Amino acid sequence: AGSVLMVIILIAEFIADLNTDRARASIRGLIGAVPTTARLRDGGDERIVPIAELQVGDVVLVRAGDSIPVDGVVVGGDGAADEASVTGESVPKDKAAGARVFAGTMLKSGALDVRTEAIGDDTTFAKIVALVEDAEDSRAPVQKLADKVATWLIPLIIVFLVVVFIVTRDVSMIVTLMIFTSPAELALATPMVIIAAIARAARSGILIKGGIYLESLARATTVVFDKTGTLTVGSPKVSAVRVVDGQLSEAELLRLAAGLDRRSSHPLAEAVVEYARAQGVDIPEPTDFEVVPGRGVTGTVDGRAVLVGNAALLTDAGIAVPTAEEATTVIHVAADGRLVGSIELEDQLRPGAKEAIAGLHANGVRRIAMLTGDNEAIARRVAADLGIDEVHADLLPQDKVAVIKEMRDRGERVAMVGDGINDAPALAVAETGIAMGAGGTQAAIEAADIALMTDDLSKIVGVRAIARRAYRTIQENLFVGVGVVHILGITAALLGWIGPIQAALIHLGPDILVFLNSTKLLTVRIKTGPDTTLQPLERN
């Protein structure tokens, strides 16, 4: 009987290991294999070399059907690359000179010459794999709770078994009870689900850095979006130029504004410079250039002291600005201490933004808020278009942090969605920080708890659905796979209905249930529409 019992218990352990190995194999296979060799362009020739011999700046040839060996920029040729392994997008992306490509992705058609920018462990592919594998070892709060329960449950079990033995003197019953009172399943119920959920998300171009973030997103009550570059495409265009100084022409106003903005990396500044160049304006080099965070830029252009920025920048300098709020973004331009004109810009809503907001509401998020440095009129127009519940406008970066802290102080569980770079402080103070468009941007991947490799807003609904499904699966594992089966087993043992061998056979039940329930996460289809309330995930 003892030998049979040992065999049955080993079978149970094998089932548990099988599930874990399957999930981890899914993680290792989610991105595909990076080739070990590359075709190096060497003058007019090409030769096959090991990846380890490549250096940054080398040009490699990639042909149709090849896996791209390095991160780099296309310098010749054209083609279409399947980047699903990195971004989760199934439609191949056209590639031509100037386009970025990633190691581990597949060139479906054409041929490319790629200038190497990152090799081996420095590639986006390698960093994604490292992050996902590190996430396997992180523990969610519910798992920590299960571990604590198992710790204090053991002495209670020992006392219980001693009492039963004193009363019954039945060794067979004690062995049977030992099988059913083992807390081993408590340690299996959570990690299997966490690994499976992380693997499933990574297949869709969503990187979750650990179980703690999976659980916090599942329980989030409020989702906060940064506006620019998240809900909007982040590529504003000049819509109007207004001159208020009769001594200046429109071209001269643009010359002053673009002269300063050419040194700025802000999207609004880049839009002004692009528009000025399109109008044929000769853009001068500024001197004494300075960035005023959350306000704009200052400096000297053509010997004149120039300020380019929002109303607060000019007001702080003692320059009067009209107080009427516009439903577009307005950049004011001042020269030599007085307002000389303004430039209006508009941004476009990101495709799918409205559907994503509706999907989050349907997925149990009670409140959705938007943070922006734009004025109240612009912010409220965008919020009305998208169905956003709460708006916070005219914010500096530190103000965004304060708003999120205030929400958390009120007891809200806050997830913040931003670009992962400019919003890093706000992402850090949120319970869950989500960076969009992190593909190829290591800073964005590192800044957030969850990184979306593309700018597809539907992925936010998808990762919320995965998180909720995983959290529910853990609860099911603990309740059905552990609680119900063990309670029934202990009852049957105390009544003398079963012995050790039957108990060991029944003991396989929780392991099999946990195995089947957890692996469902590896084979589900993510639904991202507003009908996700009833069934966030469904089988293919």
Short names for language-model regions:
Residues 1, 149-181, 205, 479-506:
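Helix-interface capping motifs at the ends of transmembrane segments in multi-pass membrane proteins
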Residues 1-37, 41, 55, 59-60, ...:
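Actuator/coupling domain of P-type ATPases
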Residues 7-10, 152, 173-191, 504-515:
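Small-residue-enriched core segments of transmembrane alpha-helices in multipass membrane transport
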Residues 18-33, 192-211, 519-534:
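Juxtamembrane helix-loop transition segments at the membrane interface in multi-pass membrane proteins
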Residues 19, 38, 57, 72, ...:
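Residue-level signature of catalytic and energy-coupling elements of molecular machines
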Residues 29-122, 212-257, 300, 389:
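Conserved cytosolic catalytic loops of P-type ATPases
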Residues 43, 212-422, 426-432, 465-468, ...:
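Cytosolic catalytic headpiece
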Residues 177, 200, 364-365, 386, ...:
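Membrane-embedded alpha-helical bundles of multi-pass transporters
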